[in-house]
A protein has these predicted regions:
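Hydrophobic ligand-binding cavity/cleft-lining segments
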Residues: 1-49
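A conserved amphipathic terminal alpha-helix motif
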Residues: 116-153
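Short, hydrophobic/aromatic-enriched beta-strand segments in well-ordered soluble domains
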Residues: 14, 112-113
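Hydrophobic-ligand binding "helix-grip"
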Residues: 34-35, 61-110, 116-118, 146
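Hydrophobic-ligand-binding modules of eukaryotic lipid transfer/binding families
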Residues: 1-15, 94, 104, 135-138, ...
Length: 153
């Protein structure tokens, strides 16, 4: 039985004791992503790939050694970024990672992390998509918050 579309969108929200600019910089810099990845899925990403706009593509290496090209599909500096991962040279198979930041004040930010696989049709990826939980998203958020707070927020 296929899940309903609402079951294919998983999200978690939390407040972080850091400014939105600092948090966003850690998300938009792919080389920082492995340090806060709560899924333990990312091994590395080369420096110098800071996302600046929709259409950018950044590469990450997964813990299993595979490379992913991440196609940026939503971008508002400091407040929203989303990308669709794909195998090199291929079209994204239909899942998306999104981060949205809402400043509460200069040192407190509400952050929402979403995994959306409503458009995923690749049967080889469905089990992995189904296994992604809000707790996994929260783990990434907790690690990101620690890094942002430690660096002066």
């Amino acid at each position: 039985m296929e899940p309903d579309s609402h079951e294919r969108i998983i999200s978690a929200t939390r407040a972080m004791s850091a400014g939105a600019e600092r948090i966003f910089d850690l998300i938009a810099d792919p080389s920082a992503q492995p340090s806060w990845d709560g899924n333990n899925n990312l091994a590395s990403a080369a420096p110098g790939q800071r996302v600046r706009q929709v259409g950018d593509v950044f590469k990450t290496t997964l813990t299993g050694g595979m490379v992913r090209e991440n196609h940026v599909v939503e971008f508002i500096e400091g407040s929203k970024i989303a990308w669709c991962p794909a195998e090199p040279g291929k079209q994204p198979p239909g899942h998306l990672w999104r981060w949205q930041l809402e400043p509460i004040n200069s040192t407190l930010t509400n952050v929402t992390h979403t995994y959306d696989w409503t458009a995923l049709t690749d049967s080889k990826r469905l089990d992995k998509a189904r296994s992604t939980t809000p707790e996994m998203l929260r783990e990434s958020m907790d690690r990101l918050a620690m890094l942002a707070q430690a660096s002066g927020g």
